[in-house]
């Protein structure tokens, strides 16, 4: 069972307004939204955590397909296709490590990007 179905089931089985309220607090603080077809989804998909850095892909994004790296002094985005730095600041050493990591994880990044596209997203799936 996927995590979204677990959340939906837990809320459906809530026995009090307090339980429902806690569920709503979790959804609002956890970065969730609803697809047009009524399905729950996560606005941000955590790809990995590495030494305090979070690597995330957001669901409803602008072109080109990219991932975000945040943590410490780093807040930058990189192209999924070629790992070109699109915006933000990152040190030379960290950038080299992110590029190396990208070379090993590109297929997984593409898989996550493609699985998190809402139907109305201006940037569709990446064709490999």
Predicted regions and their residues:
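Metal-centered catalytic cores of metalloenzymes
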Residues: 1-65, 69-128
């Amino acid at each position: 069972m996927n995590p979204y179905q677990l959340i939906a089931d837990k809320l459906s089985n809530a026995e009090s307004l307090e339980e429902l309220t806690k569920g709503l607090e979790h959804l609002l603080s956890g970065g969730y939204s609803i697809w047009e077809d009524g399905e729950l989804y996560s606005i941000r998909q955590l790809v990995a955590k590495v030494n305090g850095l979070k690597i995330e892909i957001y669901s409803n994004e602008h072109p080109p397909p990219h991932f975000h790296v945040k943590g410490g002094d780093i807040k930058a985005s990189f192209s999924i296709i070629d790992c070109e730095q699109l915006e933000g600041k990152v040190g030379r050493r960290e950038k080299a490590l992110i590029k190396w990591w990208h070379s090993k994880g590109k297929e997984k990044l593409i898989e996550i990007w493609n699985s998190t596209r809402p139907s109305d997203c201006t940037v569709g799936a990446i064709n490999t």
